Amino acid sequence: MTVQQRRRPPIASRETLQALLSEGAQALGVALSDAQRSALLDYVALLAKWNAVYNLTAIRDPRQMLIQHILDSLSIVPHLGAHGAAAAALDVGSGGGLPGVVLAIALPGWRVTLNDIVHKKSAFQNQAKAELKLGNLSVVTGRVETLRPGADVPAKFDVIVSRAFADLADFVTLARHLVAPGGSIWAMKGVRPDEEIGRLPDGARVKQMIRLTVPSLDAERHLIEVELDEAI
């Protein structure tokens, strides 16, 4: 056994992850059924399995995946409630399916579409859709600025969200044509992105900026909602 192997932390059991998820969801005010918790844990296992080959995330430890990916994604759920129980959402630059897969599990009445330009990531997303039996989840590969409502995607979206896609101004510029009337763009950010906000294009403005607290995560997190003149 090598020194590195001796120092490697033990892999958390499913029971440990389940307890962490239950406590975290409760702290966030997100109600999850047993089936939803099970699906989220299955997703962590799937992400860890495929990550070895597809390099979906720099995080390798399932416990940290649950904190930094699952709980982080769940933290935005309470703030999306204004869009109702049956909204349509687009996750841009979804990568390994974050936050879109988590939203599809936590909000089963929503129709969630994952978007990425990398085919191997879309392949994983489709695998997650199949294995987790997420009938409300769709996958579309391609650049977001080229997606056409009624052709590449069924229609415009009430919510367009991104977790780690681009500068806020670029995100808004590239995705604004896909926002439905009354809809908005939501960007998950780390530190407060004041400089990015200052570069927002004409017709776009911050509706609200929410400081998020993610259980077990010692990092600054913000959720920015941007509204557009043409979507009002």
From Swiss-Prot:
It holds the Pfam family GidB. GO terms for cellular component: cytosol. The gene is rsmG. The keyword Cytoplasm applies. The keyword Transcription does not apply. This is Ribosomal RNA small subunit methyltransferase G. It catalyses: guanosine(527) in 16S rRNA + S-adenosyl-L-methionine = N(7)-methylguanosine(527) in 16S rRNA + S-adenosyl-L-homocysteine. InterPro entries: rRNA_ssu_MeTfrase_G, SAM-dependent_MTases_sf. It is found in: Cytoplasm. Keywords: Cytoplasm, Methyltransferase, rRNA processing, S-adenosyl-L-methionine, Transferase. GO terms for molecular function: rRNA (guanine-N7-)-methyltransferase activity. It comes from the Bacteria. It is an enzyme of class 2 (transferase). Its EC number is 2.1.1.170. S-adenosyl-L-methionine binds at G93, L98, V144, E145, R163. Belongs to the methyltransferase superfamily. RNA methyltransferase RsmG family. Specifically methylates the N7 position of guanine in position 527 of 16S rRNA.
